[in-house]
């Protein structure tokens, strides 16, 4: 009996190196360490009642400190060491009778660990089905107030392209975003190009759109001229053709003024005769005094 035991011990030592080559250490994060109960269960004394099955020797007790505590070797009656892996049993849903801890390892290996990196959430625009076809939902159009439209129109007449500081300043003054101002200018430029391509006059060049106080009525004459003056010049050109007398008498000044308002020839002749009569009377009165 002692010789048989020594022969088996020698075979165990020889098979340790083989088990290290074929069975690397497997650490199970969910199972506890081997206890004295496990060693007692797999001790040669516990297996003595079933000699036809052989016995299992723990490799972590005396000989196999380098091996894992959960690895065991099965030795048959002929002393040859046979390595049994619990994976063959775990694939069928039950554990090995000699390796009960492998019933957990098979299920643990089949469970995929959760991914450590969170998936990036890609925000896609809402899509709805229209007549069986997917269609993206457009954003609502921006409604501009009359004050905002007037300010944008005035700025567009000055320049059709805005720099970044100008666009930011205009958007802040009107309470809009820079994107809204940029889109408004883009739409306005495309509209102007389309109108000019069709050969139509842009509304910006009309006086009513550029200046709200402008009037399209014809201009009134600047200088008001009496109708009698034009008539007197056309019918009586001889009034201005004759040289005026050099004397600044009241009669001569009266004749000049009356020529415009009284164009009739009879009245003009009477005035001239009256002036000629007053001139010799003035000379005679001077001699008397």
Swiss-Prot record:
GO CC terms for this protein?
Answer: nucleus
What Gene Ontology molecular-function terms does this entry list?
Answer: DNA-binding transcription factor activity, RNA polymerase II-specific; RNA polymerase II cis-regulatory region sequence-specific DNA binding
Q: Which Gene3D superfamilies match?
A: Homeodomain-like
Q: Its GO biological process terms?
A: anatomical structure formation involved in morphogenesis; cell differentiation; embryonic skeletal system development; regulation of transcription by RNA polymerase II
Q: Where is this region: Disordered?
A: 16-44, 198-254
- Superkingdom, taxonomy of origin: Eukaryota
Query: Sorted alphabetically, which keywords does the UniProt record give?
Result: Developmental protein, DNA-binding, Homeobox, Nucleus
PROSITE patterns reported for this sequence: HOMEOBOX_1, HOMEOBOX_2
Family annotation (SUPFAM superfamilies): Homeodomain-like
Tell me the DNA-binding residue spans: 137-196
Q: In which tissues is it expressed?
A: Expression restricted to anterior ectodermal derivatives, namely the ventral forebrain, the cranial neural crest and the cement gland. Also expressed in the olfactory and otic placodes.
Q: Which residue stretches does the UniProt record annotate as biased composition, category Polar residues?
A: 26-40, 206-220
CDD domains from the xrefs? Answer: homeodomain (cd00086)
Chief site of localization: nucleus
Disulfide-bond pairs as recorded? none
**What subcellular compartments does it reside in?**
Nucleus
Q: Which Pfam families match?
A: DLL_N, Homeodomain
Please note every region of biased composition (Low complexity): 242-253
Give the protein name, as stated in the record.
Homeobox protein DLL-3
Natural source organism: Xenopus laevis
Give the classification, highest ranks.
Answer: Eukaryota, Metazoa, Chordata, Craniata, Vertebrata
Tell me the name of the encoding gene.
Answer: dll3
């Amino acid at each position: 009996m002692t010789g048989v035991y020594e022969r088996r011990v020698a075979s165990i030592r020889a098979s340790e190196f083989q088990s290290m080559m074929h069975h690397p250490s497997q650490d199970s994060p969910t199972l506890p360490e081997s206890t004295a109960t496990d060693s007692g269960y797999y001790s040669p004394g516990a297996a003595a009642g079933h000699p036809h099955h052989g016995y299992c020797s723990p490799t972590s007790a005396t000989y196999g400190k380098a091996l894992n505590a959960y690895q065991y070797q099965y030795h048959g009656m002929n002393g040859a060491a046979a390595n049994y892996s619990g994976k063959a049993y775990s694939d069928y849903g039950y554990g090995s009778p000699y390796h009960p801890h492998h019933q957990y390892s098979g299920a643990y290996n089949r469970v995929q660990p959760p991914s450590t990196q969170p998936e990036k959430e890609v925000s896609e625009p809402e899509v709805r089905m229209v007549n069986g076809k997917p269609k993206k939902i457009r954003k609502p159009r921006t409604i501009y107030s009359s004050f905002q439209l007037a300010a944008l129109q005035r700025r567009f007449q000055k320049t059709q392209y805005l720099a970044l500081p100008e666009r930011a300043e205009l958007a802040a003054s009107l309470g809009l975003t820079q994107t809204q101002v940029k889109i408004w200018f883009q739409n306005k430029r495309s509209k102007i190009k389309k109108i000019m391509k069709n050969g139509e006059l842009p509304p910006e060049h009309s006086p009513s759109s550029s200046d709200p106080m402008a009037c399209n009525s014809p201009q009134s004459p600047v200088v008001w001229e009496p109708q009698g003056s034009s008539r007197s010049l056309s019918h009586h050109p001889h009034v201005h053709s004759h040289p005026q007398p050099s004397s600044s008498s009241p009669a001569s000044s009266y004749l000049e003024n009356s020529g415009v308002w009284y164009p009739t020839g009879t009245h003009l002749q009477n005035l001239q005769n009256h002036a000629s009569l007053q001139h010799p009377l003035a000379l005679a009165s001077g001699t008397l005094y």
